[in-house]
Amino acid sequence: MADFRKEGRPCPIAHRGCMEAGPENSLTAFEEAAALGAGGVEMDVRRTRDGKLVVFHDADVRRLTMGWQGPYSSGKVKDMTWEKLSQVRLPFGGHLLKRFPEGGYSNEKQYYYPWAVAPEQEVLYQMERFESRAENEEQVLSAVYRRYKEEYERRCLEDGRLERILSLREFFQWLRTQPEGFFAEVELKERGIAGAVIQMAEKCHAADRCIVFSGMDEVVWEIQDWCRSHKKPEGLRLGANIRFLKDEQKEMLDRGDFYEVGLNAGSFGSEEVEYLHQKGIQVFSNLGDTPDWWEALDHLEVDGFKTNCLGQYRKWRQKWERK
């Protein structure tokens, strides 16, 4: 196994790139992650209506386009052609994660609150209202849009910077330009694309820099089955975001070829890490951007951790080392 831990520390992995610097899953976010010393990035893959593989997390583009008044500012990725999706622009204004509370982020949903367009206490109050009344995340998003539409538009115009959505090919081409050892966790967000993603990685000579995984069981096994029935590209690694390590997950791991698994921050300890290491499986922590958890990771011998707050982690690490 590669040694992700350096000087007794876990490898920081920028979740969707550095969201403090650019829209998530954008080239700016990925480039800043590399510049800040991340060991790798986590990114997401979906497929357009006409079969183009693209780098995008959400099923719908709306959350990341708030404030931008161009064409196709809402709609599902799977219903849009690449010609249309490539015209979508992702604004910086109002969308960067500049806030870091004193105790960090213990609630994953709060990363995506509209911190950049309203005062903190108002955001907390309004989001509590929206979430208590909504039946799903789409309704929460609609409420945010109605409440803060004009403010997003103002921030977007003031900042002026825009990014576009990357194709998977473009991402792999960028990945190959990074220093040796820099890697990507490639998360598949839907069924039916495993073979195409793996073949694209091989064609772009980026397979040895990739860990292909999913948090959806059916997609995890699609990845595993494809690699069993085809020749797995040299150097390609497979993973799964299992979140917790219980008997069900242990049985699953015994049946597949797993290089790495993701566990939710706070859901595991040294016993789980040791169990997985004995099986030759690397352990990555899913987020948990709190100083207390960052400190705990050093002692748990976790191999890597995904973070939405790479810049803040770097500041914390520098301060910690001066103690």
Tell where the protein language model's regions lie, with residue ranges.
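Phosphate-group recognition and catalysis centered on beta-loop-alpha active-site segments
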Residues: 1-323
